[in-house]
Every structure is written in C-alpha cells, then in structure tokens.
C-alpha cells in the first residue's frame, strides 16, 4: 500500500515537472506547423499566379464615394506583374509585387503601377485616391478562380485565368461595355415583378420590386465580361438567385436563370 502510494506520488511529481516541457514542445511543434502551412499556402498561390500561360483577368471593384469597376489583366513572373486595363488594352504597365504574410496571407502591389494604382493612388483631384486598393488579403484560390479582399475598401476582387492574350480579351470587354446601352428593364420572378435600373457611368444596377421606392432597391456593383454583366454579389428574390446576366442587343434584354428582363 505504502509502496503504491509513493509510486503514485512519484508519478505525479514527474508529470508536474515534465508538464511545462511537454507544453513547450507542443507549442514549438504547433508554431512550426503553422509556419509550414503558411509557407505552403503562399507557395501554392505564387505557383498558381505565375503558372497561368496567358495571365489573369482581374475584376476590380473600388468602393466609397467613387465606387466603380474595371477589368484589368495581370501576368506574373517571380517578382514582377504586367498589367493592362479595358480602358487602353494595348497599354501595359510593369511593376514589382510580393506575396507575404502580414496580418494575413496577402498579395501586395508595392511599387507604383499606373494601371493597378489607378483607383488607389492619391492625386491632385483625389487626395485619398478613388476607393481602390493595392494591398489585398488572399481570401481563397483555386485553378479557376482567385478571390481577394482589399485592405482599405474591403471590396472583393476576382481573378479568372485567361484563355487568350490580354489585349484580345480586353478589346472584347471594351467593345461590349461600349455596346451595352440598357437603362431600365423589368421581368417577372415567380409571382412578383422585378425592375432593374442601370447606372452605366459608375457601373451599378439598382434592383428590386417593381413600384418600390428608390430606397427599397438594392444597389449592386457589376462588371462587364465578354458578353454578360457579372454582379459583385448575388441578388435573391422570390426563391431565385441572380449573379450574372447575359445580354441580347437585338431584343434589348438581359437574361439570368431562365428569366428575361426587357427594356421598357
């Protein structure tokens, strides 16, 4: 009995003495694995963005009082990015970038680029910029889509791999943006009538129940693809979720989820 008692005390003593050491070892292992995971995550991201043969389309959204959207293209080498914009498809701008962990895994365009800093850099007219970002938290990435969040405006940006040259793609975007001229459309969703108004200059649409007050309409930024309008975030109404509208110029209409909205 006494022997068992002393053995138990000894075991407890050894446990108490070794506990801090074990905890320290566990912390060390945890820290190491966290660092490894971060490194693997960033290495995977860097490999993805530099491995795209034609680069990426970047659906860029700015926020605040000057909110708008533009399609950029970005092509990455190990430390440089080459960018172009739908506003001038043949013009390119090259600068440095980095992929790093700051407060979170991030993609940072840390040297001036006249394309990528168009809405982020201050100027004489816009001393705080125009609601854009050049530092982004990496929200998620896969082979067919990357999502980023701006550090200042908190707007979501989307990158899609290009299947053709940047200039060819941007010329299609520019042509479509210039041809789209709808100002207001309406359609039936379930048993309800829905109206959509377009702010073509700033690239917003206002959507909601037909006859609703302006304050009841939801304001959603959109961006042009080659033949559609892609919403920055989906709109839900009467059990149907809308995220992208195809355009029919001849019919003066847009369609999503099998529902057509016509100009009126």
Protein language model annotation of sequence segments:
Residues 1-9:
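Bacterial N-terminal signal peptides that target proteins for export
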Residues 10-16:
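Hydrophobic helical h-region of N-terminal Sec-dependent signal peptides
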Residues 17-21:
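C-terminal motif of bacterial Sec signal peptides marking the signal peptidase cleavage site
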Residues 55-67, 84-90, 119-131, 185-189, ...:
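Short, solvent-exposed secondary-structure boundary motifs
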Residues 71-75, 95-98, 133-139, 220, ...:
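Hydrophobic/aromatic beta-strand elements that line small-molecule binding cavities or substrate pockets
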Residues 80-201, 205:
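Long, acidic/polar, low-complexity amphipathic helices and coiled-coil-like
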Residues 152-156, 162-264:
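Preference for solvent-exposed, low-hydrophobicity sequence contexts
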